[in-house]
């Protein structure tokens, strides 16, 4: 990893230091996704079978996972994996349930009551990728809040393996969250199918889940068309660690590597006011990297990552807020005392014994988070992501008589005569 001294960098160099790996969507990628979506819309399941054969190397008679396949998955996974997923579900449920909104009502004027009521989104589509490895944890992170929200129907798509099966852990994870409509479908074609619907795949109101550049582009295109809403902008995974001189170098290095192994376009940053800590972390990175099965992937990510020396921890937080990381680890002696300095981050991990991996799997928070700086304005997935907040108002005759004049003045100022008339008629006055 490159080591930089923030105090010695020019403004342009500082901007470059915080620049994420280039992930421009090439024109050919955008056009390929648009063509694929159009094909799925026009030919439905026929197109899906051809595309799946081309990209996944398997021809499927049926996309739907059968009850027999669910049963086989149940029998295939190790008992300790099942128990770990059950434990994770319980904690994810506990955390997300605590944050649920029940709506509210308030009288804003005599005879005028305004309410906010909460309704589940009708049908949602979950995408669980399986590029370099299947991700049953993503099925848990999406399935639990969808269940708590009360969505009428939850659809899940995940890529098939070359033998036509689906990773059994993903199927068990789906079952544990109450998801039974699972389809063997991956990539941009899965997004197109869930957005527009085919004979086999129902169209969904909102789509959730991470994916590669084709999946990300497909989500953007279907959202722009109005076919389906999406959870948030997506991008490569990332972590920023702020560490003081008392941090454990081995812990910090392990956290950086746990994010770097996601993919070659991941980015990891360390900000510290200690030269000794930075040097020790670099040594640990070299030692630990050699032991990883995905060392080649992690090494590519580290090549575009940074170890940055800062003058003060306060400066580190200013840099972090500018970067707005997906994951922020505070490897500090008094991490909670610094929490108020955090303005933009997807998820924060406090202290030496809270690795980012806990949030990925089983602490209870959600690991589907905004990336690429989107944490400045977006939040991670929650139960509210699967719900609509509907406004309700009711006015009595006395209520409209009391506040109607306000509406009349504003309607006239905007030149909207019909608006004014709708109020005036009820008040029995001239518009």
Swiss-Prot record:
Q: Which residues form a coiled coil?
A: none
Q: Which UniProt keywords apply?
A: Amino-acid biosynthesis, Histidine biosynthesis, Metal-binding, NAD, Oxidoreductase, Zinc
E.C. number: 1.1.1.23
Nuclease keyword on record: no
Q: Which gene is this protein's source?
A: hisD
Enumerate the residues binding substrate: 237, 259, 262, 327, 360, 414, 419
Q: How is the cofactor bound?
A: Binds 1 zinc ion per subunit.
From the broadest rank down, the organism's phylogenetic lineage runs:
Bacteria, Pseudomonadati, Pseudomonadota, Gammaproteobacteria, Lysobacterales
User: In its keyword annotation, does this UniProt entry include Disulfide bond?
Assistant: no
List, alphabetically, the Pfam families matched: Histidinol_dh
Q: What is this protein called?
A: Histidinol dehydrogenase
* Record-stated family: Belongs to the histidinol dehydrogenase family.
**List of residues binding Zn(2+):** 259, 262, 360, 419
Output the Gene Ontology cellular-component terms. cytosol
Residues involved in NAD(+) binding: 127, 189, 212
Q: A Gene Ontology biological process annotation?
A: L-histidine biosynthetic process
* Database matches in HAMAP family: HisD
- Describe the function of this protein: Catalyzes the sequential NAD-dependent oxidations of L-histidinol to L-histidinaldehyde and then to L-histidine.
Q: Which residues form the active site?
A: 326 (proton acceptor), 327 (proton acceptor)
């Amino acid at each position: 990893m490159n080591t930089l001294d923030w105090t010695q960098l020019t403004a342009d160099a500082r901007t470059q230091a915080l620049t994420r790996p280039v992930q421009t969507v090439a024109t050919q990628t955008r056009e390929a996704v648009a063509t694929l979506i159009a094909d799925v819309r026009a030919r439905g399941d026929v197109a899906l079978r051809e595309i799946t054969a081309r990209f996944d190397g398997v021809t499927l008679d049926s996309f739907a996972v059968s009850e027999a396949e669910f049963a086989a998955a149940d029998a295939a996974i190790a008992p300790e994996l099942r128990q770990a997923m059950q434990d994770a579900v319980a904690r994810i449920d506990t955390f997300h349930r605590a944050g649920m909104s029940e709506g509210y009502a308030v009288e804003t004027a005599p005879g005028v009551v305004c309410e906010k009521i909460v309704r589940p989104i009708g049908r949602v589509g979950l995408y669980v990728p399986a590029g370099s490895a299947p991700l049953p944890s993503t099925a848990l992170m999406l399935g639990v809040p969808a269940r708590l929200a009360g969505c009428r129907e939850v659809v899940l798509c995940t890529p098939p393996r070359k033998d036509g099966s689906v990773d059994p852990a993903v199927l068990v994870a789906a079952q544990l969250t109450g998801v039974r409509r699972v389809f063997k479908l991956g990539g941009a074609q899965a997004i197109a199918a869930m957005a527009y619907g085919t004979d086999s795949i129902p169209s969904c109101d909102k789509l959730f889940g991470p994916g590669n550049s084709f999946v990300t582009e497909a989500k953007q295109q279907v959202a722009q068309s109005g076919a389906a809403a999406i959870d948030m902008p997506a991008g490569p995974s990332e972590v920023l660690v702020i560490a003081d001189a008392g941090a454990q170098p081995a812990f910090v290095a392990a956290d950086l590597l746990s994010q770097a192994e996601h993919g070659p376009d991941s980015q990891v940053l360390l900000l510290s006011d200690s030269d000794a800590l930075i040097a020790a972390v670099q040594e640990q990175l070299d030692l630990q990297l050699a032991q990883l099965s995905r060392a080649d992937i992690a090494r590519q990510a580290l090549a575009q990552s940074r170890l940055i020396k800062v003058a003060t921890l306060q400066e580190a937080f200013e840099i972090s807020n500018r970067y707005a990381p997906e994951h922020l680890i505070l490897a500090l002696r008094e991490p909670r005392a610094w929490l108020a300095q955090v303005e933009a981050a997807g998820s924060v991990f406090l202290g030496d014994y809270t690795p980012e991996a806990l949030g990925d799997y089983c602490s209870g928070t959600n690991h589907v988070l905004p990336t690429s700086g989107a944490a400045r304005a977006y939040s991670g997935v929650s139960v509210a992501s699967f719900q609509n907040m509907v406004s309700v108002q009711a006015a009595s005759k006395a209520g409209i008589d009391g506040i109607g004049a306000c509406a009349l003045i504003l309607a006239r100022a905007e030149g909207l005569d019909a608006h004014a008339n709708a109020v005036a008629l009820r008040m029995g006055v001239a518009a």
